[in-house]
Amino acid sequence: MKLQLIAVGTRMPDWVTRGFEEYQRRFPRDMALELIEIPAGKRGKNADIVRILQKEGEQMLAAIPKGNHIVTLDLPGKNWTTPELASAMNKWQLDGRDVSLLVGGPEGLAPACKEAAHQSWCLSALTLPHPLVRIVVAESLYRAWSVNTNHPYHRE
């Protein structure tokens, strides 16, 4: 199974890239984690946020291979404990499809992305900076993988 993190925003600070890559490289080849960056729409004083969200959403959906299981990261989503995420990951594997996880920009995800989703995951009730979300998602997925494979990374 391939995990695909599709996130709005490019040119992240070096610490974000290093943090994400630290967890990305830990995954085995049969559970690869890929990052796809979608350029953020230009936001200014008179920006048309609805149009920006729509364009970002179109680009995100276009990046998803046909047949992938789609999970949005969104506040109204389900809060998963590590064992619950591990269980969800197990189900994704048994389903036999790759998974695309969508992280929106400053205004969140386009309605089209939310409508296309099969599941929605809420990382926290806190507002997290979008660059940090990449690292938290990568670590959480790695931890869930470690639970499923009895790897010593996760301890109860």
From Swiss-Prot:
Which terms are listed as keywords in the entry?
Cytoplasm, Methyltransferase, rRNA processing, S-adenosyl-L-methionine, Transferase
Q: What is its main location?
A: cytoplasm
* Protein name per Swiss-Prot or TrEMBL: Ribosomal RNA large subunit methyltransferase H
Q: List the disulfide bonds.
A: none
Q: Which GO terms describe its molecular function?
A: rRNA (pseudouridine-N3-)-methyltransferase activity
Query: Gene3D superfamilies, alphabetically?
Result: 3.40.1280.10
Q: What is the lineage of its organism?
A: Bacteria, Pseudomonadati, Pseudomonadota, Gammaproteobacteria, Alteromonadales
Q: Which reaction does it catalyse?
A: pseudouridine(1915) in 23S rRNA + S-adenosyl-L-methionine = N(3)-methylpseudouridine(1915) in 23S rRNA + S-adenosyl-L-homocysteine + H(+)
User: Could you describe the subunit structure of this protein?
Assistant: Homodimer.
Q: Which residues bind S-adenosyl-L-methionine?
A: 73, 104, 123-128
Q: What EC number(s) does the entry state?
A: 2.1.1.177
Keyword Lipoprotein (UniProt): no
- Source domain of life is Bacteria
- This chain's source organism reads Shewanella oneidensis (strain ATCC 700550 / JCM 31522 / CIP 106686 / LMG 19005 / NCIMB 14063 / MR-1)
Name the gene.
rlmH
Subcellular location as annotated: Cytoplasm
InterPro entries found in the cross-reference section: Alpha/beta_knot_MTases, RlmH-like, tRNA_m1G_MTases_N
